[in-house]
Design a protein with these regions (language model features):
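Acidic donor-binding loop of glycosyltransferase active sites
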Residues: 210-223, 236
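Conserved catalytic-core segment of nucleotide-activated headgroup transferases in glycan assembly
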Residues: 15-24, 133-190, 196-202
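N-terminal pre-catalytic "stem/leader" segment of glycosyltransferase-like enzymes
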Residues: 1-65, 115-116, 239, 253-258, ...
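Donor nucleotide-sugar binding/catalytic pocket of nucleotide-sugar-dependent glycosyltransferases
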Residues: 103-115, 121-138
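A charged, aromatic-enriched C-terminal amphipathic alpha-helix characteristic of glycosyltransferases
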Residues: 272-305
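Active-site proximal beta-strand in glycosyltransferases
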Residues: 49-54, 64-85, 106
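Membrane-proximal helix-turn-helix segments that form the acceptor-binding/catalytic region
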Residues: 87-105
């Protein structure tokens, strides 16, 4: 099958397996040996399937243009399933009509599948998050005794729930790391015992993550779930919320109901105090990753699932 992805990315062609910025969208393109085109470009060839990731900040896209070059067109969910309802009304209607015109809707999680099937009346398909391991091979065997500290998955805003994650992380009684991201707010650097990682590419991020012993990501905004997935690949237990497939599949013993800070705190304390439970959760995470998210399983699900 000849596949093309259409996104707001300003590049054209294939994605090399050693790309240092191999986030999930690039991993999909790489694994499927697809071509990438900017969403505004006109391809110079025909495709069996075109997958379009409609930009969150520019949803007024017309699928009929892609149907000139692609036998079938699928829309890939971008962001949480409710995001589009913050658009002005005319853009909400435009987005709804766009996904109705698509031949297929691809989504992140089981809950998203139920949402979009109910919204559109069409069958939807989960496109699981993916890691291309070529550039990080060997990191998942990092000895656990060499790991220290807890890392939280996002900054201090409602989108990431960083303050909630920070409070739970304090119960590990160890240094707390946090990535520097686009929603970092003024004053974060003054929080006690909180160390910001510098901005870095994906490969450097996985290397940095591999040095931590625990993860906390109490993010209410459910989408691709890459933080939980990255932790699982490395065998790092990650405390997070239900509703995110990567969290629930790879870290079931560390998953809590939305907003259940009390249970999250208790899990943090148990991971710190109970070595047997910690090792169990490490193994559970890597087993969940290996049984559900490795590249061969992704390919099987995509073409035959």
């Amino acid at each position: 099958m000849k596949i093309a992805f259409f996104t707001e990315g300003n590049y054209q062609g294939k994605v090399n397996r050693n790309n240092v910025n191999m986030r999930t969208d690039l991993a999909w393109i790489c694994a499927l040996k697809a071509d990438h085109w900017n969403i505004n470009q006109k391809p110079d060839q025909k495709y069996d399937l075109g997958i379009v990731i409609i930009p969150k900040n520019n949803p007024q896209f017309e699928i009929r243009h892609l149907k000139l070059y692609c036998d079938k067109v699928a829309v890939m969910q971008e962001g949480p399933n409710w995001y589009w309802q913050d658009y002005p009304l005319e853009q909400q209607i435009w987005y709804f009509n766009t996904i109705q015109e698509a031949d297929q809707m691809l989504v992140h999680n089981e809950i998203d599948k139920k949402y979009y099937e109910g919204l559109t009346g069409k069958k939807c398909k989960i496109l699981p998050s993916l890691m291309i391991e070529d550039s990080i091979d060997g990191l998942k065997t990092t000895p656990r005794n060499d790991r220290d500290g807890v890392i939280i998955g996002g900054n201090f805003c409602s989108w990431y729930g960083g303050f909630d994650s920070y409070i739970v992380a304090t119960y590990f009684e160890c240094p707390i790391g946090i990535p520097s991201m686009g929603r970092k707010i003024v004053g974060e650097e003054n929080m006690e015992n909180l160390n910001h990682l510098p901005y870095m590419n994906w490969v450097d991020w996985i290397h940095a993550l591999s040095k931590f012993k625990y993860g906390v990501h109490l993010m209410r905004t459910h989408a691709a779930g890459t933080f939980a997935l990255n932790c699982a690949y490395l065998g790092i237990p990650c405390i997070g919320y239900q509703g995110l497939d990567t969290q629930m599949i790879c870290h079931p013993s560390c998953t809590v109901e939305l907003g259940d800070m009390e249970s999250a705190r208790k899990i943090a304390e148990k991971l710190r105090k109970d070595e047997e439970f910690y090792v169990y959760c490490c193994n559970e995470a890597q087993d969940g990753y290996g049984s559900n998210f490795i590249e061969p399983i992704f390919m099987e699900k995509f073409f035959n699932g």
